[in-house]
Amino acid sequence: MKPSAKNELTALTARYPSLCVCSGDIESFAVELIRCFESGGKLVVCGNGGSAADALHIAGELLKGFREKRPLTAAESSALSAFGEDGMTLAAGLQRPLPVVSLHGETAFSTAWNNDADPALVYAQHAYALVRRGDVFLGISTSGNAVNVRLAATAAKARGAVTVSLTGQSGGRLAEVSDIRICVPESETYKIQELHLPVYHAVCLCVEKELFGQ
């Protein structure tokens, strides 16, 4: 990992010293994401309530530039420019993305599934459809005991993904099916959420710096 990328994680624990207890797991998550993206994989993420909002937030940071400039490569620009005026517009305006899927956007699927099948399996079905070997699955649950998130993690693990959990102090049952367990040292929901945001911001900054930074 580049020193500048590692510095993002060091800055996290400097600002939030309580996170030192899980700093190794946070770094492991960043390393796995870098490996995943470099090998053509994707991040699949889900949660409930505020954790669903966090999942969407993570996707928003990675699908476009977060803090780094992400200009297209010369080859990408050339390929787009072959499509005339619209291609030139795309070549000038698009940014290099990182592929992330939040399992919260398919309203027609999720409502149909919840109406016709077991609602606890809605994320698992979606993950099973999308996850491939080498991907990373991130399950976010403050308690670690969200059944639908745990089942999705299990489905993703069966597909060959590296599974990561972002939880509160106990880790819950989600931690049992996770290859990497980030258990922030709080037990109240809102306090857990207050630590989840800086964790995933730091990971996104680290990954972006590694892949796009100078």
Predicted regions and their residues:
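Generic N-terminal amphipathic, Lys/Arg-enriched alpha-helix
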Residues: 1-20
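Hydrophobic alpha-helical transmembrane segments of small proteolipidic membrane proteins, enriched
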Residues: 14-17, 27, 42-43, 157, ...
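A short, well-structured juxtamembrane/interface segment
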Residues: 21-39
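Residue-level recognition of alpha-helical structural elements
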Residues: 22-26, 51, 157
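Structured helix-beta-strand junction loops
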Residues: 39-40, 177
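Glycine/serine-rich anion-binding loops at beta->alpha junctions
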Residues: 42-58
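Glycine-rich phosphate-binding loops that contact phosphosugars or nucleotide phosphates
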Residues: 56-213
